[in-house]
Amino acid sequence: MSEKIVFYGKEQLQRIRIFNYSESNDKTLIVLHGGGWRDPRNSYNDFEDMANYILEEKKATNINIIGIDYRLSPFIKHPVHLIDVLTAFRYILENYKTGQLSIVGHSVGATLLLEILNYVEIIQTGLEQLETSEPSIEELQTLFDFISKNLTFKTMYFLDGIYDVRALLEEYPSYDFFVKSAFVSTVAIEEASQLSWKQHNEAFKIAVDKYEILHSLEDELLSLNQPKLFAKYLQDRKIECSFRTGNWGEHEQVYRSQAVSEHVLQNM
């Protein structure tokens, strides 16, 4: 299939980009962009270089590659970003033969990957803070049931991510300007991540074979504190993970790194 844009919802950013797809392929790579929950300059197009490396340079056309966009703050608030991503997954799984799924999340895309692992608790608590009646309980339950039955991953790649927003603000108080755009309260911030939540203590609900944490040593926006916190969280719970660093460029360059793309390709 040639490249294609498909909508999974009614809004402009509720869309996916099909970089490559064939029903005969038995692996699918999903790519999920960052941008601080709010930056329209970030989209599934961030991963064009990675897709081109895998498909053109390495000739790995036996891999489906699909990018997900989601609505942005301040127009929507947490946990609606996560609901959009799960809705996109339902659309993909209902309409395409994906085979074995792996996913790359960059920056807050990596945050969303972590949230996916306990999507029920995080969405329910987030909606309580948001005080909204949409989506309905019935709509959410249908989505939750589908995800529970159908979504598993071979590999999750967490790329220069944010895993504990509370700790992020302690380290970088100036980042408050974009965090407040995405969250309605301090409680919403704390309960959005397993590393800081207080109301839950749940095991991950989505099966994942491999956790790959990657962080560029040249990242000018995020220190190694965030990936170290996440790696410790996993290790404390006896969950195996790989934690790698390298000179892969600045924050908005790391997903363009051929070394990162090669690592993704080799570990699917």
Swiss-Prot record:
A motif (HGGXW) lies at residues 33-37. InterPro entries: AB_hydrolase_3, AB_hydrolase_fold, GDXG_lipolytic_enzyme, KFase_ver/fungi-typ. The main chain amide nitrogen atoms of the second glycine and its adjacent residue in the HGGXW motif define the oxyanion hole, and stabilize the oxyanion that forms during the nucleophilic attack by the catalytic serine during substrate cleavage. It comes from the Eukaryota. Belongs to the kynurenine formamidase family. Keywords: Hydrolase, Tryptophan catabolism. This is Kynurenine formamidase. Homodimer. Pathway: Amino-acid degradation; L-tryptophan degradation via kynurenine pathway; L-kynurenine from L-tryptophan: step 2/2. It catalyses: N-formyl-L-kynurenine + H2O = L-kynurenine + formate + H(+). Gene3D superfamilies: alpha/beta hydrolase. Pfam families: Abhydrolase_3. GO terms for molecular function: arylformamidase activity. Signal peptide: none annotated. SUPFAM superfamilies: alpha/beta-Hydrolases. Its EC number is 3.5.1.9. Catalyzes the hydrolysis of N-formyl-L-kynurenine to L-kynurenine, the second step in the kynurenine pathway of tryptophan degradation. Kynurenine may be further oxidized to nicotinic acid, NAD(H) and NADP(H). Required for elimination of toxic metabolites. GO terms for biological process: 'de novo' NAD biosynthetic process from L-tryptophan; L-tryptophan catabolic process to kynurenine. The active site is at 107 (nucleophile), 219, 251.
